[in-house]
Amino acid sequence: SSIVLPQNWLFLTSYKKFREKLLKNDTWHLIVRLGPGAFETISGEVVKAILISMSRGNSAKESSGLFGEADDGNLIRGVDVSEPRTAAEKAAQLLTAEIKSVLQAKQLENPDARVAFDKVSGELLSKYADGVNGMHGADSFHFRFNYWEITDFLIWHFFQCTHEETTHFGGKQNVFYWAEDGRCHRDNPRAYVKGEGVWGKPGVVVSMMKILPVTLYSGNKFDISCTPVISRNPAHLPAIWCFCSSSEYNEAVRRIDQKLNVTNATLVKVPFDLDHWTKVAKEKYPNGLPKPYTDDPTQWIFHGHPCGSVIWDEEKKGTAHGPLRTDDTVLQVAVARLLGYRWPSELDAGMELADEQREWVNRCEALLPYADEDGIVCIPPVRGEVSASDRLLNLLAAAYGDAWSSDILAALLKSADHAGKTLETWLREKFFTQHCK
């Protein structure tokens, strides 16, 4: 018999026993991965369908021809047309796509008996690392905020979250309420407090959606939508990072799990060649993995300097000072400083940061006198105070130092979509809209 149905049961851990039963007791003939958009009358992009053909009983002699056996073991034939976007394109590719063959009995040897067209061989990442489940407080709107909305970091703890692209450091914009050691969450049956065993340990954070972007993990509490992969041997972490940050990692995971959001257990059930990736790590990171750095002001590790820059230097194989920034965040950071805001990295001398990142944090001390004492800055001059635009101009000049010029100001206004105009009109017309992005 043949049937079209969602593909998830071929690889989800919860269907392991069901797969084992069918693989042992029935004969599988053909699996066609149709993917999203396989039917002209169904527009959904989330449901990924398969066409599967099988028969009762597990006799390797029952089929012949295309669905024949090899070495007395039944072969499952597989065709993958999941990549084309339209039903017409999929139909055309069905006629030309490669037909793969895998032994049915060998599927039982795959992790969790997952059904895959490609052979899963070699040692798994799970031999060297664990994929750890995250937590949520059952009420994100009540217990989870952006860090810049909070001032008391004794009861609000930094909370590692998902990120959109692979980068050394990302997903560091949230805090999570954790008064009395998280008592309100531990007492709440709807909340999930997970991952305590890896808090404080370094690792690799995988966002569990789409192309599985990764970032380095610094040991913070973490969201249920991302999974830290924690090396059992810290010496293996650079190799694991190099593997997980490569395209090969996403491809390996997707060979065994095509679900939109994968599970934490799946993330370490892929082949991992420790020797190979150790060599890659020695070449890419001879001085070790970087300490936290970023020029993104939405991250709690941001140095707080309006124009300071820290980059990864491929030649040096380490962090380094970059060129002074003139991007669209510079004016926003400068206004925040003018109003008296300071980043968490400035307030925590013990926060782990790259040396260059800490240098920029220290340089922010020279900008403190430019901050308003009461946090209220009027655009026009009021009661003897200088206008907001002039005060902002003075702060920027101090931040850039000898590099400051009218050309820098012009570049900043251009980056803020306000080319050829003034700081005052930017404050009046553009600042708030851009601040709320």
Regions found by a protein language model. Give the residues of each.
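General secondary-structure edge motif
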Residues: 2, 32, 186, 209, ...
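Alpha-helix initiation/capping motif
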Residues: 103-104, 201, 263, 354, ...
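Extended accessory and catalytic-adjacent subdomains in large enzymes
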Residues: 270-272
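Terminal accessory regions of large proteins
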Residues: 195, 283, 287-437
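Polyanion-binding catalytic cores of nucleic-acid enzymes and NTP/SAM-utilizing transferases
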Residues: 100-232, 268, 280-296, 300-327, ...
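Signature of N6-adenine DNA methyltransferases within the class I
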Residues: 1-155, 168, 218-227, 234-238, ...
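Glycine-rich, acidic and aromatic/proline-enriched surface loops and short helix-turn segments
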Residues: 243-250
